[in-house]
């Protein structure tokens, strides 16, 4: 499929539900690349795109049957906070930060909210 790094931003429905990233990752089960790319905002360029371990910044709600649903607003806000240094910052190339910010920010704009700026 596509290359690694930031996953192209897309518009989707959004949700204000409480966020549980671990549960949503678990619900993905053994999903393949096309499903994983719908749930996350970044993929390791050297990783296996068919494994969850190659992905970061999950922000979509995932049903128990593995269906990727709306982008979760809290997850998008948290992801941008990590890009800006929260929880030790993001362990991704500096050149990928803007693309991930754009992806997460688009979902927040879909929800009618303005994302925090990306800090240098």
Regions found by a protein language model. Name each.
Residues 1-120:
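Extended terminal accessory/targeting regions
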């Amino acid at each position: 499929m596509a290359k690694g790094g930031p996953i192209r931003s897309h518009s989707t429905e959004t949700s204000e539900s409480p966020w549980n990233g671990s549960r949503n990752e678990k619900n993905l089960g053994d999903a393949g690349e096309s499903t994983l790319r719908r749930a996350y905002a970044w993929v390791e360029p050297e990783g296996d795109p068919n494994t969850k371990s190659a992905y970061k910044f999950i922000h979509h709600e995932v049903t128990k049957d593995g269906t990727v649903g709306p982008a979760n607003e809290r997850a998008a806000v948290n992801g941008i906070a990590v890009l800006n240094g929260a929880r030790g910052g993001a362990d991704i190339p500096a050149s990928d930060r803007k693309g991930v910010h754009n992806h997460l920010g688009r979902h927040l704009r879909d929800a009618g909210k303005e994302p925090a700026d990306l800090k240098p």
